Swiss-Prot record:
NCBIfam families: ndhI, NuoI, PRK05888.1-3. InterPro entries: 4Fe4S_Fe-S-bd, 4Fe4S_Fe_S_CS, NADH_quinone_OxRdtase_chainI, NDHI. The lineage of its organism: Eukaryota, Viridiplantae, Streptophyta, Embryophyta, Anthocerotophyta. NDH is composed of at least 16 different subunits, 5 of which are encoded in the nucleus. It comes from Anthoceros angustus. NDH shuttles electrons from NAD(P)H:plastoquinone, via FMN and iron-sulfur (Fe-S) centers, to quinones in the photosynthetic chain and possibly in a chloroplast respiratory chain. The immediate electron acceptor for the enzyme in this species is believed to be plastoquinone. Couples the redox reaction to proton translocation, and thus conserves the redox energy in a proton gradient. This is NAD(P)H-quinone oxidoreductase subunit I, chloroplastic.
Length: 183
């Protein structure tokens, strides 16, 4: 009889423990139901990158003095600077400048160390192509400013995105900027 009471007690303790586990699972499920989704439907919605996002490099031809600092600080010696020396003014004159974004690691060293600030990072991150040779940008392609997602009339901004918090993922789940194409 004593073993039957112990068996019933063990069974009831296991049933209570199982119901606790199920309750904890329901709490986690209900907690996740109130959160915003972490993913977006990419072609139709776009995230607005943060202010310090390192996207495609923008180049201003008129500001460049052909000092080649960008080539020296680049970990892969990527920027190709072609110049000729003008003897009458005793200065270098820039002939061409190009960067191959198929090889670029977007470290930002060239932008940071440029003495004339002729290089800057843009918000553009959509650089995919079917031909890798199209990723080799010359000074004309580098000089074009990208159309900002915020200024594009075919895309609608939904809410704000904040990368400045220490709890990036927590803030990401609470408030973010998502853009949506207008129908």
């Amino acid at each position: 009889m004593f073993s039957m009471v112990n068996g019933f007690r063990n069974y009831s303790q296991q049933a209570i423990q199982a119901s606790r586990y199920i309750g904890q699972g329901f709490i986690v499920t209900l907690d996740h139901m109130n959160r915003l989704p972490m993913t977006i439907q990419y072609p139709y919605e776009k995230l607005v990158p943060s202010e310090r996002f390192r996207g495609r490099i923008h180049f201003e031809f008129d500001k460049c003095i052909a000092c080649e600092v960008c080539v020296r600080v680049c970990p892969i010696n990527l920027p190709v600077v072609d110049w000729k020396f003008k003897k009458d003014i005793k200065k270098k004159q820039l002939k061409s400048y190009s960067i191959d974004f198929g090889v670029c690691i977007f470290c930002g060293n060239c932008v940071e160390y440029c003495p004339t600030n002729c290089l800057s990072m843009t918000e553009e991150y959509e650089l995919s192509t079917y031909d890798r040779h199209e990723l080799n940008y010359d000074q004309i392609a580098l000089g074009r400013l990208p159309i900002s997602i915020i200024e594009d009339r075919t895309i609608e901004s939904i809410s704000s995105f904040d990368f400045s918090s220490k709890k990036i993922m927590e803030e990401h789940s609470k408030s973010r900027t998502v853009t949506k194409f207008l129908d």
